[in-house]
Amino acid sequence: MITFSNLIDKFQEFAEDNYFIESFSYGSPSDVDLDKFELYPLLHVVYTGASYDGGNKVYNMEVYILSLPPSEADKNLYQKADITNAEQVAEDILADMKNGGNIFEFEYLYEVGSASVTPLEETQSNTLAGCLLDLSIIVPYQHNACVAPLTGVQPQ
């Protein structure tokens, strides 16, 4: 069974093995604090919830790929390069999920339901730039009552 924990472990493994990514975290978007991380680019995963459709569970995630420009960097040049690099990392994640399973390999079948990339540009309130990969991952879900940890309940 593929769980939220399994998915986070795979994203962390991807971040550790990727030559571009320097840090990994997960949690809410507000957890991305400039003072919290020393190394950038950062891959930050936000679990936005799941839905159940027939025999499937759909995990919805936001994957932030962010860099911190040097203070003297030319804003436009930096953002162009960083958005390009971050988008390539997002495409590497998708390619591994859809084609290879080098990192995102599980004993169970899954598929990418939808994916989109949004560029994130530096503003006055946020000096980070990169992209947001909005991702849904579809896994089989059987609504199996046999696995419920209920005292006194016998599986049928």
Language-model features and meaning:
Residues 37-48:
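A short, hydrophobic beta-strand-centered structural micro-motif
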Residues 1-27, 46-156:
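Charged, amphipathic alpha-helical segments and their flanking helix caps
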